[in-house]
């Protein structure tokens, strides 16, 4: 009897508390089941206590009312405009279980100007600030003031340059001082033991990845600035399930990345805020992704993995602003299409030809180059007699339309799993 009375008392007190705090009631009804009762993350949703300070009230209201689409967050149109301020107040009151939320400060810079914004991280002589201009500012102490720092040269893609040379024009390291190189800082990944990331640098910030995770670091100190992370995909098979991810591409204020389950996402490079999320292919059909995208003009271009699991490979191009697919080039033909005569037997139904390595681009020729992996199954070709176009090939595509210009096949009818997966390095010869 006492237990029943006590339980009833708790329910009454809780109901009374919610009645006095409509924001808490809204959070409990619509947010807590995914993001946890304290907003620090749950089984179905990420930690939002760290993300709320990075958005304005208007941005928060838009996210709540419209959702985040393919990212998995539904829209909540039933929350009225009159109720929204109470919910936003509750969101702004969320506390981290560990660490502290970003602190707002106004700083005097060495040139006498001021900078106001959120301090995302700091050391004794350094600050990483998300300014009110919504841009990242890296600062170093000069007496009682601060000076801005940035990178001497950016490396904004997997290969550094669109033509794939991976050549750096920096001259700070040379024959005379190379023997004196020593570690400057160390950053430890805690979420992955299969690192394949290429660090990308933009405006003094280094971006590194593991599966479904991007971390922004102060390139001068290695201090973490922000982290975007989403849960690994349960039930995924193939290379994407190993945790491999080769990095990001940056253009302007946007950062582009592939997820393990073959989604292309765009983030704000200053705050890590998700801008859009587009499904390239259905992971339930064994598609996955491990590569780094390539930016060409107003498009961001990438391929997928999954050939060893029987998928049909393709290269896709997506609008940088919206994530809308603009074109798709399939690496193997369907029955009856040109090239299908090089597939004799039932193997054309599960042809492989994955496109997981990053391509290159020749601006003078306005041509995109991409490489294609092995046919499937790898070692047995009895069900796929013929050359098996366009597997084990390099293809030249029109970057605006995806139309094939030409191809060269390195290994017709590959039964050795040779692939042709490498970055095409473009050179001018005499």
List each model region and its residues.
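Blade/loop signatures of beta-propeller domains
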Residues: 149-183, 331-338
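Short loop/turn segments that connect beta-strands within beta-propeller blades
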Residues: 218-221, 268-271, 320-322, 399-401
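A detector of repeated loop/turn-to-beta-strand junctions in beta-rich toroidal repeat architectures
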Residues: 45, 261, 311-314, 389-391
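Short coil/turn segments that connect the beta-strands within blades of beta-propeller domains
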Residues: 152-153, 203-205, 252-253, 297-299, ...
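Conserved beta-propeller blade signature
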Residues: 205-209, 215, 255-257, 301-303, ...
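Extracytoplasmic beta-rich repeat domains
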Residues: 186-200, 227-249, 277-292, 309, ...
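Extracytoplasmic electron-transfer domains, predominantly the class I c-type cytochrome c fold
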Residues: 33, 38, 42-149, 155, ...
